[in-house]
């Protein structure tokens, strides 16, 4: 695998999952990613994270491209535009992921796991900060005979072993962050039982080969970073910097989701201009003093992570 160019230039990325129409939370994160890269004279790559192709029909990928372009959040390569570091759709990258996966296997770090999600929850195992169960190591030391017996009844998923080690990094928005791989994360999935590669491996491989130097994403993924930094190290790849932006909540304090039709861009485009939406989001995230209409370009010169809140952002009543 050849990594993309890292010649001092900042390369950010949009990495949406096309499981539905974009909502305001997706758009806010995309705006911050775009502004952070462009304020440093950088570029943006669009990667479509459709690992689970059945849940991510191509029509949604096409629509999110239209929505981003309509807002003025134009990317420099990727998506249907193409470029030198494709494929840009994760559903087309299984062979690329396999090569890197085999490197981890060769290090003796990958093992089969036969545990079901129901079994893990029933075991009352502790949870990570993003809600996932911290794996208790049930299948970590199975013998070859035990593995062969379990395979007769069930196809395994595959996990990577983690050490009892702290990973510390400086987040561009949230500041210093530390997680213990074993205590706070646990051995984590690399590949599902149906053969689909897991998010943690796919994003590491893709960001490296696309030359991404800066990852901006929602704070719900902050706890994934230690796991990904561990994979960068194991695979000998250059890790990017990270900035995790606060999530956007509705006026009642609930996290927005693609099921919230009122906050989807499909509906918002009928009520507001692109400049009005950008201006309102910029106001909510502290980038301008009033919710006045503006373009993304007009925000570049004044952008600073110091202006962005550290806590989740609750939409003021009546803003949208």
Report residues per predicted region.
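Non-catalytic terminal extensions that flank enzyme cores
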Residues: 1-21, 39, 44, 71, ...
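Sparse recognition of residues in long alpha-helices and their boundaries
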Residues: 49, 80, 244, 268-269
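Noncatalytic linker/hinge segments flanking ATPase motor cores
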Residues: 23, 86-91, 152-156, 200-205, ...
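Alpha-helix initiation and N-capping motif
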Residues: 61, 94, 117-120, 132, ...
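N-terminal Rossmann-like or analogous alpha/beta NTP/dinucleotide-binding catalytic cores
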Residues: 2-124, 128, 219-220, 224-237, ...
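Active-site cores that bind ATP or allylic diphosphates and position pyrophosphate for catalysis
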Residues: 118-257, 264-268, 317-320
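Alpha-helix boundary recognition
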Residues: 102-106, 208, 269, 282
